[in-house]
């Protein structure tokens, strides 16, 4: 399940944080991709895909247009969220309850996304009387494997949660397939094909599911995923509520499926996706969690609320981060060869980058508390550092079942949440 199932999480009004790359075992395949350079003389063995050329000036203009559109999208989403927040504020105030805005951020992590799926199932079991019970989220975002989880978490009903868990408990052998004996040839668009992943997205994110998503987001709630635009070298976050409505209106589900596949597409390993005539790959290249790292403080949700409603107190904001990985890799004696060195370096850097992003989110919350007198809470959960896969390999049922069980146990225990940033 590719980067989409890569060990790497989500919100559009938040710009992406640092990159957490592909899963530990899938990273080993990256070395095979590098070998392709050794076979450049074989490129004539098959036709290469071609794309219309663009000059530098055209690309710079395209980037400027994209930046403008992204800014406009962010403003619209912020506006929707503020309206949604005000409606929630009024409802809770009428009931004599303090208003709370809940934001779920789901990371990537490959097959280790089974942990997040299980965690949500366990969390769903927590009594509603518990102050840390699973809420209805005002915003849900995901990257890579988090992209698969996010729609189900957004809907939040038991049927959706069970459907998500069932998917992670039953990995298909065709989720990832090598292209054959000459899979490494540079003319191939990727080392592997993902027919199983494509099938799962078609089957689970069908028109009925899209109608549910559009209905759930009609009041301004947000569901968003991150992708990486390789042509422009930058992130692009897609609002899946808007995309779901577009699919319903047009009857065309291919676009939203391509967006999800792009968010899940490990560069070079899985096929890239062409969206709006541009090349897109794994969102984790530009942000394993999307949390607002590039947004100015005056554009943050607490600041926007103060501008819109200066005479009302800022509602409480709660950020819930599910990291489908361990913040620190398990210690090992690395083999003395370049393949092992590359694998271990990428693995270590991706986790360190995500830890830095989480620390940044905690720092941003502290700034809102100090500058805006806002009540902002951040909680994070991750796979325990002492956990180890029961069997080697990627997308193995025994490992994914183990992670679902672990996640479910931890999710049912609200003490699993940490309100402190990673300290190492």
Where are the model-predicted features located?
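N-terminal secretory signal peptides that target proteins for export/translocation
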Residues: 1-25
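Secreted/luminal cysteine- and crosslink-motif detector
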Residues: 5-7, 39, 46
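Patatin-like phospholipase
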Residues: 45-138, 154-424
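A periodicity- and composition-biased signal for non-globular, repetitive helical segments
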Residues: 13-14, 30-31, 398, 406
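Extended hydrophobic/Leu-rich segments
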Residues: 19, 26-30, 59-62
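Hydrolases whose catalytic domains are alpha/beta-hydrolase-1, hotdog thioesterase
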Residues: 149-152
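Bacterial N-terminal signal peptides
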Residues: 28-43
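Gly/Ala-rich beta-loop-alpha elbow adjacent to hydrolase catalytic centers
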Residues: 141-142, 146
């Amino acid at each position: 399940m590719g980067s989409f199932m890569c060990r790497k999480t989500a919100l559009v009004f938040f710009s992406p944080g640092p990159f957490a790359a592909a899963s530990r075992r899938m990273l080993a395949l990256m070395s095979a991709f590098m070998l392709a350079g050794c076979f450049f003389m074989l490129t004539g063995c098959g036709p290469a895909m071609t794309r219309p050329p663009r000059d530098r000036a055209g690309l710079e203009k395209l980037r400027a247009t994209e930046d403008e559109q992204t800014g406009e999208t962010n403003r619209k989403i912020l506006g929707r969220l503020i309206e949604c927040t005000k409606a929630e504020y009024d409802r809770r105030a009428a009931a004599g309850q303090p208003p709370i805005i809940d934001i779920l951020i789901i990371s990537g992590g490959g097959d280790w996304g089974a942990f997040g799926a299980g965690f949500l199932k366990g969390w769903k079991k927590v009594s509603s009387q518990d102050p840390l019970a699973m809420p209805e989220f005002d915003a849900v975002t995901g990257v890579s494997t988090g992209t698969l989880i996010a729609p189900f978490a957004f809907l939040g009903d038991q049927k959706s949660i069970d459907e998500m868990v069932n998917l992670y408990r039953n990995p298909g052998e065709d989720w990832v397939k090598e292209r054959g004996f000459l899979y490494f040839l540079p003319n191939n668009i990727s080392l592997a094909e993902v027919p199983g992943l494509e099938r799962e997205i078609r089957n689970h994110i069908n028109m009925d599911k899209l109608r549910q998503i559009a209905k759930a987001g009609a009041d301004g709630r947000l569901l968003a995923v991150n992708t990486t635009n390789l042509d422009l070298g930058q992130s692009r976050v897609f609002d899946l509520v808007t995309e779901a409505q577009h699919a319903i209106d047009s009857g065309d589900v291919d676009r939203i499926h391509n967006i999800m596949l792009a968010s899940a597409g490990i560069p070079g390993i899985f096929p890239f996706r062409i969206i709006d005539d541009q090349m897109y790959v794994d969102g984790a290249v530009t942000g394993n969690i999307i949390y607002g790292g590039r947004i100015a403080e005056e554009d943050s949700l607490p600041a926007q609320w103060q501008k819109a409603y200066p005479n009302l107190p800022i509602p409480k904001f709660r950020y819930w981060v599910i990291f489908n990985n361990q913040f620190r890799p398990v210690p090992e004696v690395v083999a003395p060869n370049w393949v092992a060195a590359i694998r271990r370096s990428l693995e270590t850097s991706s986790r360190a980058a995500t830890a830095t992003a989480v620390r940044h989110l905690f720092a941003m919350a502290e700034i809102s508390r100090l500058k805006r007198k806002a009540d902002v809470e951040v909680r994070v959960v991750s796979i325990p550092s002492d956990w180890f896969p029961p069997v080697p390999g990627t997308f193995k049922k025994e490992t994914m079942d183990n992670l679902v069980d672990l996640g479910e146990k931890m999710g049912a225990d609200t003490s699993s949440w940490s309100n402190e940033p990673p300290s190492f």
